[in-house]
Structure formats: C-alpha cells, structure tokens
C-alpha cells in the first residue's frame, strides 16, 4: 500500500514522502496513529494544501522536544529493585519503569518514547535512549540498585562486585580479629 507520511518515521522516510509499505503496517500502525495517509489523488491534493501547516506544526513540536532534550540529556535516574547477591535482578527493568523514573523527576516521558537496546536484568548504570521527537533523541542513565545508598555508591563509580568484595573482606577481617582475641584470651589462661 502506498502512503503519504505526515511526519518523519524511523527507517521509512521523511514527512511528505510517498512510500510503499505492507498493508498491515499501514492499517494497524501508520494510519491509526496519524503518521500517514493513503496515497490516493484526493489525499495527495489535500496534503499539498496542508503541507505548510503540517511543516510549521512539526517545527513547533521539534522546538518543544529540543527544549526538553536540553534539560533531559545526560540525566541519571535511580530505579530501586530487589536483586540477588550477584547483582541479578528478580525480573527486569522495563520501558515503563524508565518512564516512571523520569516522570517522578519532573519530565513528561511516555513509555513509548523509551528505547532499550537490551533488557535490563542486572544492577548497575545503564544507558537508555529517549526519542522525544522523530528528529530529537537523547540518552539518559538508569541507575538500577537495591537501595538509595547503593545507588549513590554506584553513581560515584563503584560496582556491585567491588562492594560485595569489600564487605566480604571486612567480614573476614572481623572474624580473623575475633579468633585472634579468643586465641590471646586462651593463652592468658
């Protein structure tokens, strides 16, 4: 099916282009979301008449997205999740979780705007892409941790494995000290 794009669509084309897409993609995605019109003569004529208005509208939304992008780019958001000692999450962090974290910080980001390169299934810092407008894309960081204190430590550059190793070393040291004290006490007797 041939359609006229009303806005830029990733991996498809720019606004105003007539492109050939599969019928299901057009019927189920492009047409219902208002991203395209069927490419027949009447729609082409009406699009040409509205083209200047649509371009102005697109430019306005792009400016708004760029203003939000300026504030949002490079931001870090904390997501608290329960995890095993090795750092593997019980479940995963989804686009909804990322959108909620950004919304709690005062940004209006929908879960459809979040793009995860891969599922987030472990603790740590993860870079996530946010598409605010088809032409405005920013990167944010999700700090996935078990607690706020752990998130602060991760943000300062320490990994979960380093923290676990430090805790284990401290526990071993305390046990060794305890045995030394017990040994010294038994020698005194």
Curated annotation (Swiss-Prot):
Keyword Isomerase: no
Record flagged with keyword Electron transport: no
GO molecular function annotations of the record: rRNA binding; structural constituent of ribosome
A Pfam family hit: Ribosomal_L9_C
UniProtKB keywords: Ribonucleoprotein, Ribosomal protein, RNA-binding, rRNA-binding
A biological process from GO: translation
SUPFAM superfamilies in UniProt: L9 N-domain-like (SSF55658), Ribosomal protein L9 C-domain (SSF55653)
Gene Ontology cellular component terms for the protein in this record: ribonucleoprotein complex; ribosome
Top-level taxon of the source organism: Bacteria
InterPro entries in the cross-refs: Ribosomal_bL9, Ribosomal_bL9/RNase_H1_N, Ribosomal_bL9_bac/chp, Ribosomal_bL9_C, Ribosomal_bL9_C_sf, Ribosomal_bL9_N, Ribosomal_bL9_N_sf
HAMAP family for this protein: Ribosomal_bL9
Purpose: Binds to the 23S rRNA.
Family assignment from sequence similarity: Belongs to the bacterial ribosomal protein bL9 family.
Name of the protein in its database record: Large ribosomal subunit protein bL9
